[in-house]
Regions:
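Amphipathic, small/basic residue-rich leader segments at the start of a protein or domain
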Residues: 1-84, 101-112
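Glycine-rich beta->alpha junctions and the first turn(s) of the following alpha-helix
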Residues: 2-4, 8-9, 75, 192-238
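N-terminal glycine-rich flavin-associated loop
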Residues: 78, 82-101, 127-130, 140
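A short, Trp-centered hydrophobic/proline-enriched beta-strand micro-motif
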Residues: 113-121, 165
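Short Gly/Pro-enriched turn/cap motifs at secondary-structure boundaries
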Residues: 125-128, 152-155, 172-173, 199-206
Length: 238
């Protein structure tokens, strides 16, 4: 049954690329236009919920199916695969490392495209050196206050939900044990989108700076139940 569904979806994606993507891809890439209509169609096709279990509103299909979908999308336009790929990392992190409350709250919306987003990991000064990020989350009586910035974030301006990687223990040894992940919504006070980056290629999909200035989030937005698990969570998601 799942195999048949996978075949049908891959065939549908191939048709979508030929009929909807091919006629507009050159203009969208050249003018760096976010493909909202195409992304909305991807949501209608169920692509944002490919690996999310059915109990949370997804299709519950395999990563093999997802990789085949990436191939078909990339044949038409790599940027569409980028939109889906980053979104899928976000979904994976919440599914595999979030609490049941977090899964029930966010996964149905991630599956149907109500929530779209990505991973706030990279910073301008540290690149992929995760242990040396400078974004800090300080715990208080009501939750966490996050300060810092993220760079090169896919889906940065058009996303509305992100996992933000932050330091929670500046004195941890080794450093990676002082890193935690947090679920941040675009509407959270203190969260904003900075500059959109101009790229030579891989255009259309937005790549942006994210700014967190005294960003207040509740305690239950810590991904999972324990601080200090962020590094291993992110490595698993990637």
């Amino acid at each position: 049954m799942k195999n048949e569904l996978s075949k049908q979806i891959i065939s549908t994606v191939r048709q979508f690329v030929n009929q909807d993507v091919a006629p507009v891809v050159n203009e969208l890439e050249d003018k760096d236009i976010y493909p909202k209509e195409l992304a909305d169609k991807m949501a209608e096709l169920g692509l944002f919920g490919i690996n999310i279990p059915e109990e949370y509103g997804g299709l519950g299909l395999s990563f093999k199916t997802l990789s085949d979908i990436f191939i078909e999308l990339s044949k038409g336009w790599m940027s569409l695969a980028g939109i889906l790929g980053t979104h899928t990392i976000l979904s994976y992190l919440i599914l595999n490392h979030g609490t049941e409350q977090q899964r029930k709250k966010y996964l149905p919306g991630l599956a149907n495209g109500l929530y779209r987003g990505g991973l706030g990991l990279t910073e301008s000064h540290s690149g992929s050196d995760v242990q040396n990020i400078k974004t800090v989350a300080k715990k208080n009586d009501e939750g966490y206050e996050i300060n810092g910035s993220k760079m090169f974030i896919t889906n940065g301006s058009n996303g509305n939900l992100f996992v933000i990687v932050s330091k929670t223990n500046l004195n941890a040894t080794p450093k990676y044990k002082g890193i935690s992940c947090f679920i941040v919504e675009k509407v959270d006070e203190g969260f904003s989108v900075g500059q959109k980056l101009n790229k030579l290629g891989y255009r259309g999909v937005d790549t942006c700076e994210l700014l967190l200035q005294d960003c207040e989030i509740p305690l239950n937005r810590l991904l999972g139940t324990e601080e200090g698990k962020g590094f291993t969570q992110v490595m698993d998601g990637l």
